């Protein structure tokens, strides 16, 4: 006799339902996993206690179009940074191509990667920190000695807070290899008692409003991204380190991209060459006038007067002047007769000088906001905050600032 066992059937149905649910859940999890693997950036970590050129290059070369999550670790310090490649900015240092990478605004972190060097920069507790690494050991040792030399004279007990050599963790011998250096710029300036520099009288007004910025010269939305060429000429006899000049270039480009959303419409292309010109004295005004005259008389520069030029040196000029430029001298629609030019120091301890002088070239005036890039005294802040300045920069780059940008 066949007797239906309802309890047993209920159990079978329950098992079937559970099995189906498990299968659906598995499919759902697989789909979620697939979506995550496609959309989520890869996560990696960098140990700052032993960071080298190879470490930075390996991680940065692997940054995809989706970006990449990199965790910076240092003895209890952990920062997760979403890193994206800056595809708008091109840098050529002689024969070396350099790529830039930025974190999100809240990350306050940026990277620079060249064929022979790499730089990591970030802010921590309001202080600017840089890690600098070179690929070749000889050059790495030279850079380490260059930055260490001023501290040897101070004998400061807190020197390590400002400057530190990073050694290869795999080397166990007494003579460990230096793979990078760490510099806390804010602490270093205090220990070394570096002078406070200002930007007062750091620009020259042209005889007339250069190439009159008129409504007819602007357009609401550019038809395509405009490439702005910035030609940086190494002053004759001046030593320029690629990690320093590329950082100045990165700050200059980022300062403009942040203005009214210009990063959608502007590309910067920086190149570095050497010039035979050198300033005849320490007078910055005289130096800039001579530099502009040398460009006008150089047959190789003929036909390139629509570009921006910088004379760069490692040092400063008389009266602690960090740079000098022709004010409001560039408009994207007209040639400038080489007056869209300036001078800038490349010193690591004074970030953003090229960005400040570029601001003047694009028409930005000094402000009374100490957190503004265009503040008259050097503070190290890297962003334009004045609406008036940002509007004139946008006009000089060829269009009106759109509402809501």
Curated annotation (Swiss-Prot):
Matching InterPro entries, A to Z?
Fragilysin, Fragilysin_N, Fragilysin_N_sf, MetalloPept_cat_dom_sf, Peptidase_Metallo
Among Pfam families, the record links this protein to: fragilysinNterm, Reprolysin_5
Q: Where is the signal peptide?
A: 1-25
Q: Which residues bind Zn(2+)?
A: 356, 360, 366
Q: Which reaction does it catalyse?
A: Broad proteolytic specificity, bonds hydrolyzed includes -Gly-|-Leu-, -Met-|-Leu-, -Phe-|-Leu-, -Cys-|-Leu-, -Leu-|-Gly-
Name one process (GO BP) from the record. Answer: proteolysis
The coenzyme or cofactor needed here is: Zn(2+)
Q: What does this protein do?
A: Diarrheal toxin that hydrolyzes gelatin, azocoll, actin, tropomyosin, and fibrinogen.
What family does this chain come from, according to its entry? Belongs to the peptidase M10C family.
Name-wise, this protein is Fragilysin
